[in-house]
A protein has these predicted regions:
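NAD(P)+-binding Rossmann beta1-loop-alpha1 motif at the extreme N-terminus of oxidoreductases
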Residues: 1-50, 67
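Short acidic low-complexity segments
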Residues: 52-71
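A conserved active-site cap/scaffold subdomain adjacent to cofactor or substrate pockets
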Residues: 179, 205-238
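An accessory alpha-helical subdomain
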Residues: 183-190, 208-222, 246-247, 252-257
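Short, well-ordered alpha-helix to beta-strand connector turns
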Residues: 23, 58-59, 72, 98
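Rossmann-like NAD(P)(H) cofactor-binding subdomain of soluble oxidoreductases
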Residues: 76, 81-144
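Rossmann-fold dinucleotide-binding core
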Residues: 113-214
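NAD(P)-dependent Rossmann-like dehydrogenase/reductase catalytic/cofactor-binding core
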Residues: 227-360
Length: 360
């Protein structure tokens, strides 16, 4: 299948490599012309995983976004949610009937891309799919090398609009066999693991993160008090899902930490792979890193807004959001991605359900 991968980050390189090795005709698009030329000159991406190190050559590497979009049946956008608004405008007029666009994870970016297309006058029947995590535990070690320490085994995925679920699922499953269909894109957004795992890890490790040059939040930074906080925060996420009427499995993050529980998104050994790999011993800025700007400011703010919409009390969600706001000197409830900022908070439950199913 013709697949395009949009972006040049960790997950983008991993996707380009993985999907090429699965036999798809992959185009990798990235904006940075200098880094793009370096890749084009080399023609291959180096990958290091459990199978060893090797070179993989995507079919095409380009900075032509129109060409990348128009040639593909499936477009994968494994970029931080902080890129969504600008990218949605850039691509709004390019989508074509029958395409499936995969946002792993989405933070309800599916609606942002769909609305941008409609605002640009594009009425193409496109499906925007989103899931709860990247399909890869991956880190770029240099311009040409990506290390992949784990591959997702379960990707609960919702479609926008949900009326296209059967068609989109059948197409996307050819690219990612690990996807599992769920109710709709909002259900997919509420599977997002980033705000649950990263928010306590960075806020409760703020001291060592700012003191040491590098700190591993998944090893030394994961202690019993932080795990207890993560479980309590996840309980609020699951309560939000249940209040919206979404069914189990809710993929509780506790499954990620305990191989004896149900299989989580990265399988039963996902956390052990994080422990074994020191690629996550990083310099994490609490004002610029995506764990704050994507997972807290956008992702946790979105959860908070869903709780407000449902009139559901989520004190830990709001408390952690307030701490992130204090560190950064701005109110994440105002600056973040919320149902209010998306113009959806005035819809009643029936109207929201219809929007999720039918689109605009």
């Amino acid at each position: 299948m013709k697949v395009s991968v949009i972006g040049g980050g960790h997950g983008c390189y991993a996707a380009a490599v993985d999907l090429t090795e699965k036999g798809h005709e992959v185009t990798l698009w990235r904006r940075d012309k200098d880094l793009l030329k370096s890749l084009q000159d080399k023609k291959t991406i180096s990958v290091l995983d459990a199978r060893g190190e090797r070179e993989v050559e995507p079919a095409s590497i380009t900075d032509d976004i129109e060409a990348a979009i128009k040639q593909a049946s499936v477009i994968v956008i494994p970029l931080p949610a902080t890129t969504h608004e600008a990218l949605a405008v850039l691509t709004a007029k390019l989508w074509q009937d029958g395409q499936v666009v995969f946002l792993p994870p989405g933070t309800f970016g599916s609606y942002i891309f769909h609305k941008a297309a409609r605002d640009a006058g594009n009425q193409a029947d496109v499906t925007f799919a989103e899931t709860g995590t990247l399909p890869y535990l991956a880190r770029k070690r240099d311009t040409h090398l990506v290390a992949i320490s784990g591959y997702a085994t379960r990707l609960p995925t919702g479609m926008f609009p949900a009326k296209n679920t059967d068609y989109a699922f059948a197409l996307l499953q050819q690219v990612y066999p690990s996807i599992e269909g769920i109710e709709d894109a909002l259900s997919g957004a509420l599977m997002n693991a980033g705000p649950i795992i990263h928010t306590p890890l960075i806020l409760m490790n703020a001291g060592p993160l700012e003191h040491f040059e590098k700190w591993d939040i998944h090893n030394e930074g994961t202690q019993s008090s932080i795990r207890a906080t993560t479980d309590a925060l996840d309980a609020e996420r699951i309560a939000i899902r249940e209040a919206f009427g979404y069914a189990a499995p809710h993929f509780p993050l506790a499954d990620h930490y305990d191989a004896e529980r149900d299989e989580w998104m990265y399988g039963n050994v996902g956390h052990e792979k994080l422990h074994e790999n020191r690629d996550w011993c990083e310099d994490i800025s609490l004002t610029t890193h995506r764990y704050m700007l994507e997972d807290v400011e956008l992702g946790l703010a979105f959860l908070s807004s869903c709780a407000d919409y449902l009139q559901l009390d989520c004190p830990l969600t709001n408390g952690l959001l307030a701490i992130g706001s204090a560190i950064n000197g701005r109110d994440f409830k105002q600056s973040g991605r919320t149902l209010h900022s998306l113009g959806l908070d005035q819809l009643d439950r029936d109207a929201l359900k219809e929007l999720l199913h039918e689109g605009l």
